[in-house]
């Protein structure tokens, strides 16, 4: 089912992100997490794609396994970096064959320590180019669904790390939507005002597709530093930093504060009519399950009944 159809039928949506594990032990842990979170009936789940396509097969295998062995609707990430048109066409054909309905099209991170890599030589310079290529694939009839793949793209409430000019940033996002994107899923943020401002600027720019908010609960002090790296410099509000500092070296307290803060974010987002919330789980279920409990719901469908 296309995500834009899900958003029409199930708003507000709740969904989860996983990343492909690289060891057998991590795989077993992830499948346990997936089993625990499947009971919460997410609208969809996404699966990340490593820098420079480094997890191409791992991502594919996880997506296909989720598709075949669970009731979940997987959405694979796909990036521009280090891919030829032939590479992307092959990846899309394999996902179409597996019955995958959606793709999240991203610019992607450059590969680390790859000698001689020149970004200018990539077939897809921007995510909008990748969106346009997927749209062309759809029009070629390569998918059992006559509409082809549903297409999502990323948004950055705190600003894109490589595009400090907010006007140009919004032009790039508009280009992705004009190329065929159905919805936007945002990078994580910790100040909801950043999201509301981003959403308002999108509407002013003529971007009217649904916008899903990305939320990642803090579960450890060290995890905060890692989050900032993953999000290319996430901004932590002073009130959150003060709450974390009061915990000192008590990691259990840090986790409780982080989950409470994320829950308050979710409640506020829901009160402000958010289209959906996407939880960055880091392949763990505890924080997400605690947020559901604090929201007073046992699964995603219960949230829609209460809305």
Q: Which ranges hold each PLM region?
A:
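N-terminal amphipathic alpha-helix/helix-capping segment at the start of soluble metabolic enzymes
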Residues: 1-16, 23, 139-149, 300-307
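Conserved N-terminal beta1-alpha1 strand-loop-helix module at the mouth
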Residues: 1-47
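Active-site-adjacent beta->alpha loops and helix N-cap segments on the catalytic face
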Residues: 3-6, 26-28, 53-65, 84-90, ...
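Active-site mouth loops of central-metabolism enzymes
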Residues: 13-29, 74-86, 150-168, 245-260
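Conserved, mostly hydrophobic/aromatic
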Residues: 17, 45, 95, 176, ...
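Short, acidic/polar
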Residues: 24-37, 59, 85-92, 164-175, ...
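Catalytic cores of alpha/beta
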Residues: 83-96, 168-172, 197-203, 220-226, ...
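Active-site pocket-lining/capping segments in soluble small-molecule metabolic enzymes
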Residues: 122-145, 153-162, 204-259, 264, ...
């Amino acid at each position: 089912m296309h995500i834009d159809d899900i958003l029409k039928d199930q708003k507000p949506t709740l969904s989860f992100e996983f990343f492909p594990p690289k060891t057998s032990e991590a795989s077993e842990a992830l499948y346990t997490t997936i089993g625990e979170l499947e009971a919460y009936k997410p609208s969809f789940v996404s699966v990340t794609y490593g820098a420079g396509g480094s997890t191409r097969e791992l991502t594919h295998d996880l997506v296909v396994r989720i598709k075949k062995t669970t009731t979940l609707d997987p959405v694979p990430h796909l990036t521009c970096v280090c891919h030829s048109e032939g590479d992307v066409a092959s990846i899309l054909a394999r996902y179409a064959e597996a019955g995958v309905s959606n793709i999240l099209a991203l610019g992607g991170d450059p590969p680390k320590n790859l000698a001689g890599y020149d970004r200018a030589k990539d077939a897809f310079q921007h995510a909008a180019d990748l969106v346009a290529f997927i749209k062309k694939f759809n029009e070629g009839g390569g998918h059992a669904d006559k509409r082809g793949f549903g297409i999502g793209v990323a948004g950055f409430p705190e600003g894109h790390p490589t595009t400090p000019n907010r006007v140009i940033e919004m032009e790039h996002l508009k280009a992705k939507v004009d190329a065929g994107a159905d919805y936007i899923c945002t990078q994580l943020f910790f100040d909801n005002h950043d999201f509301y401002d981003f959403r308002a600027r999108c509407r002013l720019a003529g971007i009217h597709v649904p916008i899903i908010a990305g939320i990642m609960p803090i579960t450890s002090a060290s995890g905060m530093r890692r989050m900032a790296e993953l999000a290319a410099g996430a901004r932590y509000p002073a009130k959150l930093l003060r709450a974390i500092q009061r915990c000192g070296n008590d990691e259990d307290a840090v986790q409780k504060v982080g989950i409470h803060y994320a829950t308050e974010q979710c409640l506020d987002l829901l009160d402000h009519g958010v289209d959906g919330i996407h939880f960055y789980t880091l392949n763990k279920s505890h924080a997400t399950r605690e947020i559901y409990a604090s929201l007073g719901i046992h699964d995603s469908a219960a949230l829609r009944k209460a809305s």
